[in-house]
Curated annotation (Swiss-Prot):
CDD domains associated with the record: RHOD_YceA (cd01518)
Taxonomy, superkingdom: Bacteria
Catalytic activity: uridine(34) in tRNA + AH2 + O2 = 5-hydroxyuridine(34) in tRNA + A + H2O
Full protein name: tRNA uridine(34) hydroxylase
């Protein structure tokens, strides 16, 4: 029986990927459709992807599939054909091709079965996820941006919105999608007469969010087909103005795709214009935050002087200090400071 999981260390896999001479293409896709046995589907897809040297992150659930992957350029069309043949529900599926791609987005294939392909926190048995809002194409998006009766709702996390968003788009301040859904309903209660346009990175979150808004009594709901990625691609192809400002945050090694030249965010340490996310180099922290080149040199890639000092300690002492610490997701929130940290480190902006 073939091995259906990775057995090589991350460091070795990354080194192998960086040594590759063939270019790679970063692709994302999703599909809401019923999967009777996600574990069986997972194993079959794992073999298909491995045979084509595909890396990336794939989630499967009874409700469908969500994938962000890296495919050798010479295998892209073969991958597309085999994916379309895998299940009738996947035939003709839109594949979002990365806009700003160095081919180094992933170096290992991780494929997991989950309860949901997007953690939404919805437990209402009457919710119909298929009753979604209407799709918008690039030209229609631009027209809506000029419509005074339209409100654009960003269904991404705060750190994604911080580095890039559509003109005048409303941020739903939250750290997770499950937190955003009830907040979006609450914040829009006074605007039920408005046209609500929802968007996200590649479409998966705003599609479900549009259905949730309709479930909660909002009738004028649209969402951008293919999200920011497809909008920017189509706008450029059609010679339309690209109305997304800044950088599109992505959840892979790149951490962002440049959409426009504007830098709308600031370094979390010194306040200089910057939109480059990084993880703190201290293995006991790994906080996600924005750091400019000057501060990266000053703090040696760390989020604070304390982390800088700790990362310089002998490995044994670092491990001793990390023992017993929680290791949750740590994200810098400009409005609330450090989240989920156990180091007791001051806010990096102070």
């Amino acid at each position: 029986m073939p091995v259906l999981h990775n057995r090589i260390s991350n460091d070795a896999l990354k080194a192998k990927m960086l040594a590759e001479s063939e270019p790679r293409t970063t692709i994302s896709f999703y599909k809401y459709f019923h999967i009777a046995d996600p574990k069986v589907t997972r194993d079959a897809l794992y073999q298909l992807f491995t045979a084509l040297n595909v890396f990336g992150r794939v989630y499967l659930a009874h409700e469908g599939i969500n994938a962000q992957i890296s495919v050798p350029a010479s295998n892209v069309e073969t991958f597309r054909a085999q994916l379309y043949d895998f299940d009738p529900a996947l035939e003709g599926l839109r594949l979002n091709i990365a806009l700003d791609d160095d081919g180094k987005s992933f170096w290992v294939l991780r494929m997991k079965v989950r309860d949901r392909i997007v953690a939404d926190g919805i437990d209402d048995p009457h919710f119909d996820a298929s009753n979604v809002g209407e799709y918008l194409q690039a030209a229609e998006v631009n027209a809506m941006l000029d419509d005074p009766d339209a409100l654009f709702i960003d269904m991404r996390n705060h750190y994604e919105y911080e580095v890039g968003h559509f003109e005048n788009a409303l941020e739903i301040p939250a750290d997770t999608f499950r937190e955003q859904l009830p907040k979006a309903v609450e914040m829009m209660q006074a605007h039920k007469d408005k046209k609500i346009v929802m968007y996200c990175t590649g479409g998966i979150r705003c599609e479900k969010a549009s259905a949730w808004m309709k479930h909660n009594g909002f009738n004028k709901v649209w969402h951008i087909e293919g999200g920011i990625i497809e909008y920017a691609r189509k706008a450029r192809e059609q010679g339309l103005p690209v109305r997304f400002i800044g950088k599109n945050f992505v959840f892979d090694e790149r951490m962002g795709e440049r959409i426009s030249d504007e830098i709308i965010a600031h370094c979390h340490q010194c306040g200089a214009p910057c939109d480059s996310h990084t993880n703190c180099k201290n293995d006991g922290c790994h906080l996600l935050f924005i750091q400019c080149p000057v501060c990266a040199e000053k703090y040696k890639g760390c989020c604070s002087e304390i982390c800088c000092e700790e990362s310089a300690l002998p490995p044994e002492e670092q491990r001793r200090r990390r023992a017993g610490r929680e290791n949750g997701n740590k994200i810098f929130n400009k409005s609330r400071g450090r989240l989920n940290t156990t180091l007791g480190i001051p806010d990096p902006t102070e």
